[in-house]
Amino acid sequence: MNDSVAIMKKGDVLRFKLELALKNSWTKETSSDKENWTPDNPAWGQCAVTALVVNDYLGGEIIWANTVLPDGRKVSHYFNKIDGREVDLTRDQFPEGAVIPSGTPRRKGFSSTREYILSYPETWRRYRLLKQRVQEFLKLLGETSI
């Protein structure tokens, strides 16, 4: 039992470091909405590329949901499901009162949601930039095992 507790703790540490690295790597250049991105809402427009990076490091699947904002507008949103649990590191981009459904995979003819997201060249570019920044940040934290 002690071995599984140690593994869980290591996984929790990795997730903490990854979340810290992501939040410190988000910029206007990694956002899908550069015009409305601000340092006050750094998660804005980061959901697809963040879900891809989380998938790289933690596995699981990428999920899509049509988020309903308090004013009734619907916004496309991606997050992760890992070991049956929702992991949404960009939920904070939405105002209080936004409703994010449980979501589904979004493939649109591709074999996975990941492949669908990466079929967009601009998203691919933003993903590569974010992943590079995250890798550099993790190295600064002394994380060499990933």
Q: Predicted regions span which residues?
A:
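A structural boundary/capping signal
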Residues: M1-I146
